[in-house]
Amino acid sequence: SGSCTTKTCWTTLPPFRLVGNILKQKYEKPVQVEPVRARRTRRPAFLKIKDIKNFKKPRPTDMVYLQRSPNYCDRDPRVGSLGTVGRQCNRTSIGTDSCDLMCCGRGYNTHQYTRIWQCNCKF
């Protein structure tokens, strides 16, 4: 008949929210590993599970880590963290400046300020 049909296939990513949710689940249950060096070379030959008590061989899609992250709530000059003690936070925020997140469960003091200024109002 002279007509033809064309099919085009491509790979698409899942919705961004789904990717974020899956990454968060993996972040909450990571597996600590340590590199084991090969005898003849200095390169790591494989990764060994660090915590044998909770042994669970990580799957290729699991999140693994080599060392624990520093505690940024406390001052630690070794890693360059000044800590969060004494910093201002936003009591009504749900972001990174929120008091719940920034104060690391230590609690916080609230201060109320009143500011008076002339607004050049005309009646």
Swiss-Prot record:
Subcellular location as annotated: Secreted, Extracellular space, Extracellular matrix
Q: List the disulfide bonds.
A: 89-104
Keywords from UniProt, A to Z, are: Developmental protein, Disulfide bond, Extracellular matrix, Glycoprotein, Lipoprotein, Secreted, Wnt signaling pathway
The record's GO CC annotations read:
extracellular space
Write out the GO MF terms.
Answer: cytokine activity; frizzled binding
Q: Where are lipid groups covalently attached, annotated O-palmitoleoyl serine?
A: 1
Chief localization class? secreted
Outline what the protein does.
Answer: Ligand for members of the frizzled family of seven transmembrane receptors. Probable developmental protein. May be a signaling molecule which affects the development of discrete regions of tissues. Is likely to signal over only few cell diameters.
* UniProt-recorded name of the protein: Protein Wnt-7
